[in-house]
């Protein structure tokens, strides 16, 4: 059986928590889009975790978590989250990343921050994680994909 948790582009609507609850029974959990915005908080036997990049399934050793090609992949943040959960006693997650996932670059974050500053009191409340500039590049097909930047033998 397939279960899907799909948001209506509202952002903070509880998708991560619902996915975590359903993850107890899932073999595979796929994060198909989005980036390291506000994130979601998971509380379990290992502790309390604020995830921004990792799919919720990383806490279940029977579950394979997949980051799909629609995700705004912030690689340093991804590595940091994996290190943090492992440090707190979570087994190394089974994690696959699409080779077509596009990478959030530092200039995406810088542009996001500059735009917020430029807008001043009319800013839209960005998390300054580079998501809007990232997706502009993705849809213009000018970004950097994982397949172009990482050695195939690299393990996340």
Model segments located where?
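N-terminal phosphate-binding or glycine-rich loops at protein starts, especially the Walker A/P-loop
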Residues: 2-34
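Short coil/turn connectors at secondary-structure junctions
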Residues: 1-3, 24-27, 37-38, 45-49, ...
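Catalytic cores of large soluble enzymes that bind and process phosphate-bearing ligands
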Residues: 7-10, 14, 66-77, 96, ...
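Glycine-rich, N-terminal phosphate-binding loop and its surrounding beta-alpha-beta segment
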Residues: 39-113
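Hydrophobic alpha-helical hairpins/lids featuring a short glycine-rich hinge
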Residues: 80, 84-152
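Conserved small/polar residues in nucleotide/adenosyl-binding loops
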Residues: 155-156
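Gly/Ser/Thr-rich helix-start
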Residues: 8, 12-17, 35-36, 126, ...
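Short, mixed-charge, low-aromatic patches
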Residues: 32-40, 113-119
């Amino acid at each position: 059986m397939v279960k899907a948790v799909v948001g209506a582009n509202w952002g903070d609507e509880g998708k991560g928590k619902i996915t975590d609850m359903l993850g107890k029974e899932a073999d595979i959990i796929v994060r198909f889009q989005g980036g390291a915005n506000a994130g979601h908080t998971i509380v379990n036997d290992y502790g309390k975790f604020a995830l921004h990049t990792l799919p919720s399934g990383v806490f279940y050793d029977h579950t394979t978590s997949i980051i799909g090609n629609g995700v705004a992949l912030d690689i340093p943040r991804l590595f940091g989250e994996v290190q943090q959960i492992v440090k707190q006693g979570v087994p190394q997650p089974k994690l696959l990343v699409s080779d077509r996932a596009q990478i959030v670059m530092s200039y995406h974050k810088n542009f996001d921050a500059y735009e917020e500053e430029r807008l001043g009191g009319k800013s839209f409340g960005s998390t300054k994680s580079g998501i809007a500039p990232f997706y502009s590049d993705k849809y213009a097909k000018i970004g950097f994909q994982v397949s172009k930047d990482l050695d195939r033998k690299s393990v996340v």
